[in-house]
Each structure stands twice: as structure tokens, then as C-alpha cells.
């Protein structure tokens, strides 16, 4: 199992890493088949591990995965994160549903508007126990650059659908549509 081999290698390197997940898009994507997402305690921890990896482990790993998949170190992107809401309880599932929204503020809206929207969202107490979200800020220069990336996480598609029904029964969809454009309207890129 390549995942177990990778985990063993990372453990032997002594990297300070908070976790890693492989997420696969629900719809085919032109530029990738999956994303290997790594969570770091700091940018310094990420840079130290990444430098060690590139200098001492990258070539051997490429041989190990040859014919299975390939990756480009030029496509390793760092985001800072801010947790918007923690789950009421952590899911014990090994799989999750992720929704990424790459958003820009509409005219008249800004981070203060987003703050108010988040306060309204966080006041809803009936969302599923395992839902949580965070805001991501690219620490690189994507083109086009979003004002922020909104990431929702659920343990299942069913929990997501239930929460969306609750969200849609409020005034929050209208507030979101007035505040931001994410994709062509408010579109998410969905991952398992």
C-alpha cells in the first residue's frame, strides 16, 4: 500500500505534520486526478519538511510510484487557514465530503460583511454535529486571485444535503449571493 509506505517515510523523517488526506474530485478535472492535502503546524515546519523531501526522498519516491501516478512539486501550494466553526463532535469516519468555494466580494462587500455572515451562520444550532468550515488564504499568487476560499467539511453527502436544506431555509443564501461571487455564481468544487 503506497499510502502506508508514504506514512512510514514521513514518520521516519521526523516532519512536524498535523495530518494528511487524499481528496478526489467528485467530477473529473482537467489538471489533476486527486489532491494530496497536508496540514502543517506552521509555514516553517512545512518548508523544513518540503526541503528535506526534495533533497533526500523525492527521487526514490518517484521510483516507487512510477506507473501509478505522478506529481509536480511546482503544484505544491500553501494556504493559511482560519477555522470558522469547529464540529460539535469529531467524525470517526475515514472519509469526508469537502466543498471548496473560491470567492470574490461583490461591490459593497468586504471582510466585515463576511464577518457578519459568519456570525449569522454560526448562530444556527441545528446543523449536523460533524460539520465544520474554515477560510483559506492562498500564500501564493493564483490567477485569478480569490478574496478568500471557503471550505466546508462533512463526514457524508447525506449530512451535507441535510445541512444545505437547513441553510436554504434561512436568509443566508440571499446574503451570500449579495456578498460574494464564487465561480459563476456560488459554485463549489466538491471532493470526497
Enumerate the language-model features and the residues they cover:
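Short S/T/G/P-rich N-terminal loop/turn motif that feeds into the first structured element of a domain
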Residues: 1-192
Amino acid at each position: 500500500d503506497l499510502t502506508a509506505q508514504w506514512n512510514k517515510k514521513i514518520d521516519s523523517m521526523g516532519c512536524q505534520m498535523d495530518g494528511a488526506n487524499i481528496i478526489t474530485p467528485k467530477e473529473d478535472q482537467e489538471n489533476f486526478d486527486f489532491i494530496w492535502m497536508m496540514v502543517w503546524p506552521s509555514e516553517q515546519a512545512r518548508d523544513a519538511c518540503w526541503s528535506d523531501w526534495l533533497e533526500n526522498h523525492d527521487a526514490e519516491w518517484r521510483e516507487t510510484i512510477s506507473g501509478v501516478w505522478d506529481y509536480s512539486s511546482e503544484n505544491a501550494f500553501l494556504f493559511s487557514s482560519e477555522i470558522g466553526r469547529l464540529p460539535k463532535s469529531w467524525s470517526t469516519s475515514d472519509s469526508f465530503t469537502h466543498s471548496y468555494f473560491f470567492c470574490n466580494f461583490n461591490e459593497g462587500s468586504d471582510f466585515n460583511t463576511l464577518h457578519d455572515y459568519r456570525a449569522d451562520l454560526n448562530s444556527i444550532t441545528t446543523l449536523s454535529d460533524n460539520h465544520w468550515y474554515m477560510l483559506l488564504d492562498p500564500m501564493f499568487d493564483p490567477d485569478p486571485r480569490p478574496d478568500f476560499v471557503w471550505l466546508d467539511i462533512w463526514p457524508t453527502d447525506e449530512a451535507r444535503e441535510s445541512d444545505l436544506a437547513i441553510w436554504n431555509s434561512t436568509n443566508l443564501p440571499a446574503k451570500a449571493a449579495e456578498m460574494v461571487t464564487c465561480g459563476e455564481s456560488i459554485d463549489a468544487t466538491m471532493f470526497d
